[in-house]
Amino acid sequence: MYNSNSYIPDLVEIQRQGFFYLLEKGIIEEISKRNPITCFEKQIEIFFYPQYYRLTKPFYSIQQAIFYKKSYVSKFYIPVQLTDRKTKRIFLKWILLAHFPLMTNRGHFLLNGSARVIINQLVRSPGIYFRENMHEIFSNKWSEKPSTTFRRFYADIICLKGTWLRIECDKDFSMWAKMKKGPKIPLLWFLLGMGLSEKYILNSVYKPMNLLQSFTKEMEKMQKSKSSKELKYPYISSTKQAWEQIQKLFKLKKTLRKFSFLKKNEEKPKTFIFGQSSTKIEAKVVFSDFAAFNNSVKRENTVFASNDDTFLVQTSFETKKKKNTRKKENFQKNKTQKTTKLSLQNKEKRVASKLEAYELGRKWFANKFMNPRTYDLGKQGRWLINKKLGLTIPLEQTTLTALDVLTATDSLMKIEDGFFEIDDIDHLKNKRVRTAGEALQEIFSIGLIRLEKSIRLKLNGNGQQSFFQKTSFFNFDSLMSTRPINGAFREFFGTHPLSQFMDQINPLAEITHKRRLSSLGPGGVSRDTATLAIRGIHPSHYGRICPIETPEGKNTGLVNSITTYSKISFHGYLESPFYKVYKGQVQRNLGVFYLSPDKDDHFQTATPDLNLTPLGFLPKKPIPVRIGKRFVRMKTHKLALMGVSPLQMISVATSFIPFLEHDDANRALMGSNMQRQAVPLIRPERPLIGTGLEARVVSDSGHAILAKTSGYIVYSSGSKIYLYTI
């Protein structure tokens, strides 16, 4: 039987808390990122004031929305200022931006009369993670065991939006920066491109020679490729990228036999046979679409000049005979395979200075990692990076900085020598919960991007002047449309895998659905490729994720339930309540202390089912204690924390099973899942054997009638209840 002095938190608070954060801060953050919207010439500026937005009273109540099969939404109004710099006129008006879906008191949404629930998603928290990689070298392909095995470490910088960055160390201890797409580059180049000086970089890291090794390797590789290119193709001298594009486009080794081009002030075109001419021509690839200008029966590439410094290259298919015919005259028509435009320039014109190349590199890095529109760590990611690397960068700085990469490089070098430990990616301190509010905030951001594109299209169109020729606000209203944001919400609730039709078989099924935790969906793992390490039970799950309730089949371990007492912190981490213990006495009068997963490994935690004296003292004999992953026996005066209830480690559905400690784990899993499939009785009655949580689940689910004030019930019937209050 359930018996505890601790108070069970609201079972649907997780859903309401996420939506409340969206209304309080999330909407303002997303609109502020898009301010202001300007046209191409920046003569017209549109500015939103998100802190003054208003939501109207819903047109349909909850009961009416269900009865008429309508949506429970509110009109979203926001003040918008439009400034015309050319005529120096300012317009300010409240604009209807969208029909915003509202959450009911029971923690779900109503769309077209149907109740829908947004599942909480458990994903890897944005930040930095240090991992190890085992390299095995076999003496030959038939050997069973590797002849040499060595460890190397790497760091992953994960973001909410943008490109993931990996800093790795190869077998020669050279440092490289690597992205998902593209080749790896020396880490020294990466740091230089982010704006740091070479002297500052080498003086700030633990082992500067590791940075110089990768830099030296890349320079030697470039010198070799440059010398071999000039010997193999003596008639052309171009940048490496230009030559690779020419090879990719025209497959020179297979199809090109002759190069014919017409230079300026020459009458006849010169023809160069592939690989034999010694004439050098500076080439730079310029991509553009051109119509076919020649069809040649021969398999060759022909080049003609189109103006002073450009020429066209055309590749044509070889003429082939049609199949299933005896006539020799029937041939297929020639079709141009590819036509592209190349520009010829003198060597003196295209010599770029080192300063220009440096500025181009800086622009690329700034757009890739320092632009808030293309890269976003989020406040949680910035907080985690600051905590791990010991930085004090403000939480508002959600893009990557040069100091982040430099400090991560220094930490990675120290991990090689054993100064720090690597991260456990399955630990809950490296995972966070994306609530319903965050999912809606992301969809709202997508709708704002669509709205911004439509506004820019209208402002940059031919009818740009028509918006400001009249003094009426009619044309100003036509700039704004509710379709982009409404369409984004409609797509999310209709097609997103985390938006599900609410399970309404019984009150327990409804509560469990709203407290579900899924690792699937966009940004998560796939059920087909998830390993046992992801599905398994981790010691950090204690008091946070139920080890029993999970589906059977492919979703085992990927879909879980939050425990009865757990709650979600501001940063999205699952926290579990504990009592503080001082010199063997449990300090219940101080209330509960919520412990985050990152602090779980540093405290000695006792089980909550110990017998206490009337004054709250623990037994004097050694008791079982958990310290991180280990279970030991320890004297009570060394304890720091104690659990609040035996129900702390299991979910709501599992806590409905009487005498759970005598049940087999596999049967308990099936029982917790099958309880949600029970249909309600026509004549409700109390269970013969219960655990004491039944009434709480019914009240929190919203199925029971709740009195707004306390008092005495003086009369009750099937139609009314009289409550007497003082």
From Swiss-Prot:
GO molecular function: DNA binding; DNA-directed RNA polymerase activity; ribonucleoside binding
Pfam families reported in the protein's UniProt record: RNA_pol_Rpb2_2, RNA_pol_Rpb2_3
GO biological process: DNA-templated transcription
Protein keywords: Chloroplast, DNA-directed RNA polymerase, Nucleotidyltransferase, Plastid, Transcription, Transferase
Catalytic activity of the protein: RNA(n) + a ribonucleoside 5'-triphosphate = RNA(n+1) + diphosphate
Location(s), subcellular: Plastid, Chloroplast
Location (main, coarse): plastid
Enzyme Commission number: 2.7.7.6
Top-level taxon of the source organism: Eukaryota
Broad EC category: transferase
The UniProt record lists the keyword Ion transport: no
InterPro entries per the UniProt record, alphabetical: DNA-dir_RNA_pol_su2, RNA_pol_Rpb2_2, RNA_pol_Rpb2_2_sf, RNA_pol_Rpb2_3
Entry GO CC: chloroplast; DNA-directed RNA polymerase complex; mitochondrion
Keyword Calcium: no
Self-association and partners: In plastids the minimal PEP RNA polymerase catalytic core is composed of four subunits: alpha, beta, beta', and beta''. When a (nuclear-encoded) sigma factor is associated with the core the holoenzyme is formed, which can initiate transcription.
Note: In S.obliquus the gene for this protein is split in two.
Similarity comment: family membership: Belongs to the RNA polymerase beta chain family.
Summary of the function given for this chain in its UniProt record: DNA-dependent RNA polymerase catalyzes the transcription of DNA into RNA using the four ribonucleoside triphosphates as substrates.
Protein name from the UniProt record: DNA-directed RNA polymerase subunit beta N-terminal section
